[in-house]
């Protein structure tokens, strides 16, 4: 048992000064005034840093020089372990490894690997995000068109049978029958709209069928026009739909993030959609069967198509504060509490309270990570 002291604590709801977080057996035992700590307890100083729940990234293709995509060798427990270690350096304690449009065979391998990883590493990766393959070719982005397809009963059944390790599926609502969306949602999978050319009417039909999330708002969806709001307009119009947004200033203009925040409130989640260069020093990598080039913060293919980001969660937090003018407490909720709610893990993650998993991060006022704790263990100390 130990207590984190001498920092500013953000519980997920409020900032507390002169308080401590007591950690024991991998869980938060209490959040209490420093004056109430037992005299014999070990105290670990935060040296004035801000202590927050660990960040939760619900869309992450790769980082730390690796990708959970493309090949049987890459879709492995080892890749997920490398991604977790890279994440921890940027304050991210939990994430959804994202496997983009690929073959049935590699999807099934991803499920097997996820099951093995979850048995070995609790409260870190939180299940698989399958981004595709039921997308609209018009909005495929960097996804391999040879693998984009319509749903078939066998694959739908397989996903539902493995819903305990598949947390989220991204699909184009106009390409997937309502009964398939409902079946996935009823199995306990978060169904997300993305890589879609849906009209407002098609998007709303998808929402009624069971879609509760939207993948990287504004990206890989039609422009909003006066007569046709499209998927983006539907997301902004529907109060209960969660969505992720990439806050690197390259995927989405900061003015659009501000507008989305005004409309979506507590349903807007920070995501990175990161790829191998995040937390690594590389200039190119393979993604969706293509060479992707990393230059000046951009990840693009040979045609200039955006192909994921190099963003880390702490960089996204800083960008939302410094470039969007969103208050720090609300930005931290966008990186912790709101994604936890979106994927249904808020009872154990996303806030600092007694009984919650002790996944936390600490950072300086200039957004440098000083400490990351996973299951009560300090995994990063700087």
UniProtKB/Swiss-Prot annotation:
Annotated consequence of substituting residue 251 to N: 500-fold decrease in catalytic efficiency
Co-factor binding comment: Binds 1 divalent metal cation per subunit. The highest efficient metals are Zn(2+) and Co(2+), followed by Mn(2+), Cd(2+), Fe(2+) and Ni(2+).
Documented activity regulation: Inhibited by high substrate concentration and by products glucosamine 6-phosphate and acetate. Completely inactivated by the treatment with 5,5'-dithio-bis(2-nitrobenzoate) or 2,2'-dithio-pyridine (2-DPDS). Inhibited by 1,10-phenanthroline and EDTA.
Matches recorded under SUPFAM superfamilies: Composite domain of metallo-dependent hydrolases (SSF51338), Metallo-dependent hydrolases (SSF51556)
Enzyme class at the top of the EC tree: hydrolase
Catalytic residue positions: 273 (proton donor/acceptor)
pH dependence: Optimum pH is 8.5.
UniProtKB keywords: Carbohydrate metabolism, Hydrolase, Metal-binding, Zinc
Pfam families hit by this protein: Amidohydro_1 (PF01979)
Positions with a binding annotation for Zn(2+): 131, 195, 216
Effect of residue 273 to N/A: Loss of catalytic activity
GO biological process: N-acetylglucosamine catabolic process; N-acetylneuraminate catabolic process; protein homotetramerization
Keyword Zinc: yes
EC number assigned by the record: 3.5.1.25
Pathway membership: Amino-sugar metabolism; N-acetylneuraminate degradation; D-fructose 6-phosphate from N-acetylneuraminate: step 4/5
Reported induction: By N-acetylglucosamine. Induced by low extracellular levels of magnesium via the PhoQ/PhoP two-component regulatory system.
Cofactor: Zn(2+); Co(2+); Mn(2+); Cd(2+)
Domain of life: Bacteria
Deletion consequences: Synthesizes high levels of glucosamine-6-phosphate deaminase and over half of the amount of glucosamine-6-phosphate synthase compared to wild-type.
Chain positions recorded as substrate binding sites: 142-143, 219-220, 227, 248-251, 306-308
Catalytic reaction list: N-acetyl-D-glucosamine 6-phosphate + H2O = D-glucosamine 6-phosphate + acetate
Any one of the GO CC terms: protein-containing complex
Subunit text: Homotetramer.
Reported function: Involved in the first step in the biosynthesis of amino-sugar-nucleotides. Catalyzes the hydrolysis of the N-acetyl group of N-acetylglucosamine-6-phosphate (GlcNAc-6-P) to yield glucosamine 6-phosphate and acetate. In vitro, can also hydrolyze substrate analogs such as N-thioacetyl-D-glucosamine-6-phosphate, N-trifluoroacetyl-D-glucosamine-6-phosphate, N-acetyl-D-glucosamine-6-sulfate, N-acetyl-D-galactosamine-6-phosphate, and N-formyl-D-glucosamine-6-phosphate.
Family: Belongs to the metallo-dependent hydrolases superfamily. NagA family.
Protein name as it appears in the record: N-acetylglucosamine-6-phosphate deacetylase
Name of the gene this protein is made from: nagA
